[in-house]
Amino acid sequence: DRRQRQMCIRDRIRTAPEYLKALKVKSQIPEIKFYSDEETVSLIVKERKSLSRFGDGEFMWMSGESMVSFQDYSAEFASDLTSAFKSDNENLLVGIPHGVFDSSKCNLYAKMHWRIIRANFLSRLVKFMDVNRVYSDASITRPYIDYRDRNYSAKIFDLLKRIWDKRDVVIVEGEKTKLGMGNDLFDNATSIKRIICPAENAYSKLEAIKSSIRLNVEKDTLILGALGPTASILASQLCDEGYQFVDIGHVDVEYMWYLRHAILRETIEGKYVNESGVKTCSDVYDNDSSYINSIIDRVLS
């Protein structure tokens, strides 16, 4: 709407000086190896690998920095993130944002964002990275709003749908996330169940969430996590226990934006979209029978 467009324009104007400053920073970009998105999905589908994703926020926390966010900082939280990132479990794929190294497919605003991240955060990323490791692209679950080509977005969404094709799925999500409600994203899954977790500070319930999964989820079931940085940790720790956990992040929001031909990170009725700048959402899906019947546990208090 008009208000969101105005907010977006103001944000881009505010970003411009930081971007111009970032252009002057000559970053030494290391040679980091990446799986293609096709290779990542193939490994998840054929070899049942898990995926843990890390962005600039996770690297800030790992570096000991707190920030205004939906997740409070603690030393234990940072330690668990770092352990997940450095995991040597061969069944765990670790994702980092490919845009930091190559943003050629991105739109102008995303290119500005990644250039700023490269200038300000690359040194922090590098100290955690293993140049001998092959990483996945953490942005594989965000194939729309930052990209110029809708055909590319359509291709990646079709690719992602292979992950849960004909699989029994348990979604571990925040209580306002409601993955798949209002769209057909998961229609090709055999079944969808949910474990509902806190929308904010989910890490405080980490052990309770793991206990719920152990109690309610069979190990041949695919777990999809949409729980911020807590999902990054869960992917690693549950992979160590023999589960397949894919940190799927913002995929549902990105898909809704794609269906709407959105040009901004706009609100979506009935879903909490933290990037829209709006902290509330309607209860449009709260009494939906398909949503209610899919819930197998709530880990909230």
Role assignments for model-derived ranges:
Residues 176-220:
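A mid-sequence, solvent-exposed acidic-amphipathic segment
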Residues 168, 221-222:
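Structural motif
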Residues 167-168, 191, 244:
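Residues at the starts of beta-strands that form the adenosine-phosphate
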